[in-house]
Each structure stands twice: as C-alpha cells, then as structure tokens.
Swiss-Prot record:
Sequence similarity: Belongs to the peptidase S10 family.
Key word Glycoprotein present: yes
Tree of life domain: Eukaryota
Pro-piece positions: 26-52
Organism lineage: Eukaryota, Fungi, Dikarya, Ascomycota, Pezizomycotina
EC number: 3.4.16.-
Carbohydrate-modified residues: 20, 63, 94, 155, 228, 271, 309, 378, 436, 444
Subunit structure: Monomer.
Described function: Removes any amino acid from the C-terminus of a long peptide. Digests preferentially peptides containing a positively charged residue in P1' position, as well as arginine, lysine or phenylalanine in P1 position of ester substrate. Also catalyzes peptide synthesis.
Organism: Aspergillus niger
Keyword line: Carboxypeptidase, Glycoprotein, Hydrolase, Protease, Signal, Zymogen
Any one GO MF annotation of this record: serine-type carboxypeptidase activity
Residues at the catalytic site: 211, 430, 507
Name this protein carries in UniProt: Serine-type carboxypeptidase F
C-alpha cells in the first residue's frame, strides 16, 4: 500500500486535525495513512475447499520450526493447514532487530520454490496482503468472517509474507535506513537466517509486492543476484503491482491524472465546466505535452528529470481532483475509484484512504489472542507505521528519507536482465499509481540494450478461471454457474519484461481481481508462456 497526502494543507488542518510536526514525519508519498492514523513442473487449479493435511505430512515441520507453528487463529473456523509465523533476527544473536513473517506452504504438490510478498507504504505491514489479498483465507472489508480463498497463491507455491523494513508491523527495532540498499542488506541476512531455520536450500526464489514495494522488490531482487549464491538466493523472477518504479509524483500521478479522470468521469461525476478547468491546468502546466511526447511506442527518447514545485499548488492537479471528488462521493477511495458509500468496516481499520473503526470493533492483528496465536510481540500493531521507517528526513526522490535512485535507473533493468521473467502490472481503477504513469516509467527505462517497449501493449488477457468464491450463492438463487471472466486486461512482453494492465482493479490487484492476479503468478512461476 502506498500513501501520500491527497488533501490540501488547509483541508488537512481543518478536517483531519493534522499538526505540522506529524505531517513532517513523512513525505508526500507516504503521508496519507498517517494523517488518518496519527511451462510447468505441475499445474494447479484454483480451488474452493482444500483437504485437511495430517500434521505428520507437514513439509517444513521440524524441531526448529515447531515454535513457529500456528495451529489455529481466532475467528477462523476451518483448518489452517501448515502455517508458521514469528520473528527471525536480521543478525544472529541480536533479537532486538528482527523481522516478522507468515509462511504458508503450498496446499498442493510440494515445490522447491519460495514466493516472497512485500507490502509497501513505506512502513505498511504485509499482513494486509496475507489477510485480504493472496493468503489461504481472506477477510475482506464489510464481510462477516474469514473465508477460504480459492485463488490463494498458496495453491501454486510456498508463500512468505514479511513485515519489513524494521519499524513495520510486528517487526522489531529502531529504524536506521536512509536507502533501499540498506533495507535490502537487512533482508538478505534475515532471509538466509529464515531458510536455515526451515531447512531450505536450492529453492527457486521469486520476489513480489505492490505499491512502494515497487522500490523494495527490485532492490532486494538485485541484492539476491549480487550474492552469487544459488543455494540461498536463486532468484528466478519478480513481480510488482501498481509500483513506484519511476518519478512518482510528477510522472506516475500528476501528469496522467486528467486523462484518467476524463476516461472514468462516469465514476467522478464532474460537470463540463470543471472538466474544462482540469484540461486547462493539464495543458498550461505542461502535462499534456509531456504525455504526447513520451507516452509513445517505440520510446521517443530519455525523459528529462521532473519534480513538483510544492510551494506552488497551481499545478497540483492531483489534489484538485481528489478534493473535488469528495463532494459527489464522500466515500471516494483513490485505491479503487469505483467504491461508493458506505465506508465498510475493515478488521485492519483502513478500508479506504481513511482510518475507520466502528465503536466496539477491534483491529484483528492488535488483539491479544491473535498475537498469542501468531507468536507476535506484544506491541501495538497498525497496518502502516506512524513513525517513518527511513531516517533521512524528507529527502530522496519520493520525499520519504529514502535516498536511493528510482528502480528504472539501474536495479530493475538488472533484475530483468538477470531473470528474463519480471512482471509489472497496474490496475485501471487505481488513482494512487496510475496505469499510464507506470507505462511512462517503463518507456524511460533501458533494459537488454533498448529503451522502453517497441510496440504498444494490445494483446488481451482472457481469464477462463471460473468463479469459485460466489458460485454457490448464485446457484442457490437459481442462476447458472458462472464461468470465466473473459477479457480482463492487456499484456505485452518484450526482452524479459511482461506488462499487465488489469481492468476493473484498484491498487491491490490480488484483492480486487484475484483471478487475474492468479494468472499473473502462474506466468511468473513458469507455469504459462503467456497470460
């Protein structure tokens, strides 16, 4: 999950009561949450219900892993299967700096591979994805209780969710990082220690994530390649959804937002005069010329460095849009623009871009019984950290105190060239990282000897996976069984990089379009040649 301030300073001060000291802790990229929170070896189909696996058949249960085993979870009224969670130190013997993990081995035929998932933020817990995106069960906002996830990534592979960097979720330690290189160095140490506990060697490794993890994933993947150690770091591919890979505020948000509104105005409901005002800003601030020149195939050339002038709000068309849309739709969610009122109860306390918990409700992972069951430390858990996980002030390309270069400049090309199996995807209903902004970033990246894609993406993604989540309900109500979704996106592959545009999906693609995300993972793992 990726966060930034979407409201003007005046509106924040009045309606969210955010003081300057709090706002100064985070850059534009990460402030949003804090304002409110103060060809396959095997094939595997999506499944509705899994068979219970006897404990004696658990693949990774041994004397070292036994203390991490999770036997049950509160409010989960079905068998968890093989599951582990807890803390593993970054440096052996120093438990004061430890990362928290959840590990769910595949429920199918055993595979010698690990798929790592990282949420973004920066500072947002990967337990969000575990519980609401791609874990073995999901508890979505507005739903009564957890249910089995027929499109869980655990159907296909062994999945490891990690709260990182230090200061995120249940992880322990005082943040010290000012760069992605430091975070990747910590993760390399943690991951090797984790593998030694679980007796893992010579596994294929895939690194995945979303949002600000568009920075984590390439840097950690590149660090794995740099280890030159296939026993522990045999990187075979990477995936990043709605990722911060290029210049975030100008290229991935501000420049493409007006065309985005024009395309989706049935959801924004802006009148003709306001649309004309937006179009005028789009042209006068140079965004139209920038898109016309650089969002072309093949790439027209290296894009000039761009940065927003935050002292002059005239060209901050993104915030103008986000403020205005709250009038026709007070429950507008930039993570998924088709959401309308009411704001749904969310067991993680973050249903849209605002912190919301009804009276009498509790945050699931902050419950004492849940912490005990998951071997978690007795600290306050929040979906995103209140304090910054970087200590570089408001510097760096995203004003988060993270001074590393944007991934398109070096590490992402390195990972593509080192694996020839990288997927970058964007959801068309995401207004936090916009689809055309991500494409603009790709068109400014040189990999395997060429700049950008030569050809505009156009090949459809046809999803023939049936509806396994809700089919029983529809059948009970007299409807015919629901089949595949049909065309749900656009794919394009060149020189080791797969582009995937997902229709009707917001920022968290495994949550909003789980069948499409399942197909993406099949490709990443080498189970398919195309999407």
């Amino acid at each position: 999950m990726l966060f930034r301030s979407l409201l003007s300073t005046a509106v924040l001060a009045v309606s969210l009561c955010t003081d300057n000291a709090s706002a100064a802790k985070h850059g534009r990229f990460g402030q949003k949450a804090r304002d409110a929170m103060n060809i396959a070896k095997r094939s595997a189909n999506a499944v509705k219900h899994s068979l219970k696996i006897p404990v004696e058949d658990y693949q990774f249960l041994n004397n070292k892993t036994k203390p991490y085993r999770v036997e049950s979870l509160p409010d989960v009224h079905f068998d968890l299967g093989e599951m582990y969670s807890g803390l593993v130190p970054i440096e052996k013997g120093n438990v004061s700096r430890s990362l928290f993990f959840v590990f769910q081995p595949t429920i199918g035929e055993p595979v010698d591979e690990i798929t790592i998932w990282l949420n973004g933020g920066p500072g947002c817990s990967s337990l969000e994805a575990f519980l609401q995106e791609n874990g073995r069960f999901v508890w979505q906002p507005g739903t009564y209780q957890p249910v089995e996830n027929p499109y869980s990534w655990v159907n296909l592979t062994n999945v490891l969710w990690v709260d990182q960097p230090v200061g995120t979720g249940f992880s322990l330690g005082v943040p010290t990082a000012t760069s992605e290189e430091e975070i990747a160095e910590d993760f390399v140490k943690f991951f090797k220690n984790w593998q030694q506990i679980f007796g893992i060697k010579n596994f294929k490794i895939y690194v995945t994530g979303e949002s600000y993890a568009g920075r984590y994933v390439p840097y950690i993947s590149a660090a794995f390649l740099d280890q030159n150690d296939t026993e522990h770091f045999n990187l075979k591919g990477a995936l990043a959804y709605d990722p911060c890979i290029g210049q975030f505020d100008y290229v991935q948000e501000e420049a493409p937002v007006v065309p985005f509104v024009q395309k989706n105005n049935a959801l924004f409901n802006f009148n003709a005069s306001f649309l004309a005002e937006l179009e005028s800003i789009h042209e006068q601030c140079g965004y139209k010329d920038f898109i016309d020149q650089y969002l072309v195939f093949p790439a027209s050339g290296v894009q000039p460095p761009k940065a927003m002038n935050w002292s002059d709000p005239t060209c901050d068309v993104y915030d103008i849009v986000n403020n205005a849309v709250l009038d026709p739709n007070p429950c507008f969610n930039p993570y998924e623009i088709n959401e309308m009122c009411p704001i749904l109860w969310d067991v993680l306390g973050f249903p849209t871009e605002v912190d919301y918990l009804p009276a009498g409700a509790s945050i699931y992972f902050d419950r004492a019984d849940v912490k005990r069951a998951m071997h978690a430390p007795n600290i306050t858990w929040s979906e995103c950290s209140v304090e910054s996980v970087f200590v570089g002030g408001d510097g760096g390309p995203e004003q988060e105190g993270d001074y590393s270069a944007n991934p398109i400049e070096h590490v992402l090309p390195q990972v593509i060239e080192g694996t020839n199996r990288v997927l970058i995807g964007n959801g068309d209903y995401d207004m936090v990282i916009l689809t055309n902004g991500t494409l603009l970033s790709i068109q400014n990246m040189t990999w395997n000897g060429k700049l950008g894609f030569d050809t505009a993406p156009s090949t459809p993604i046809n999803i023939d996976i049936p509806d396994l989540m809700y089919n029983e309900v529809f059948i009970e109500n007299g409807y015919d069984p629901q089949g595949g979704q049909g065309v749900m996106g656009i794919q394009h592959y060149e020189r080791g990089l797969m582009w995937a545009e997902t229709f009707q999906s917001g920022h968290m693609q495994p949550q909003f379009q789980p069948r499409v995300s399942y197909r993406h993972l099949e490709w990443l793992l080498g189970r398919r040649d195309t999407l």
